[in-house]
């Protein structure tokens, strides 16, 4: 993990919690976005925890540059309040999720592990709530991309937007989990989405998923 935040106390708190876990380690810290990009390129962390508001280079542009690395790390953006438009901008720039700075330690660790796993669920529940309240405007490009999906792929994408894991989707459709993984791979490829969160953003932009849609059915 790489911690990028201009507040040293925030970094120290996150480091203490993360380093207490046997499967997680903080490999570096940065106090501004530009240094965060440099360290991400040098250290190649699996996950970057990125503040949105920072000097020199803000977290949105830093996220865009970090996720352009090859291979790109996952990015979790930090925000001080739940429905932050900057958090949505960071997700559109490439972040996989966002996390409140005052999240409980167990929530933070669960979010980091979820994002690191990549294909577990779309992101912490706060991310879906953000998309519901600050739903991206309809985008004809997104509509055209979603139109290339098969009916089953659209059904899987809707299930992904509800935060379901591959196993939960497989159980719902009574198919093997490997079949769902194949569908997800096709969806990401057709939508040119980097990960599940980006695919879900496109689903909102195409109005395949709308704010207030149920998370279960």
Where are these regions (language model features)?
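Active-site residues of response regulator receiver
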Residues: 5, 51, 79
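The feature encodes the CheY-like receiver
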Residues: 10, 55, 83
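Acidic catalytic/metal-coordinating carboxylates
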Residues: 32-35, 56-61
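Short amphipathic alpha-helix used as the core "switch/output" element in two-component signaling
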Residues: 38, 60-72
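Active-site beta3 strand of CheY-like receiver
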Residues: 43-49
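Short, flexible helix-to-coil linker/hinge segments that flank and couple to helix-turn-helix
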Residues: 85-92, 96-97, 102-151, 155, ...
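Recognition helix of helix-turn-helix DNA-binding domains
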Residues: 163-198
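Basic, Lys/Arg-enriched C-terminal extension of HTH/homeodomain DNA-binding domains
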Residues: 188-217
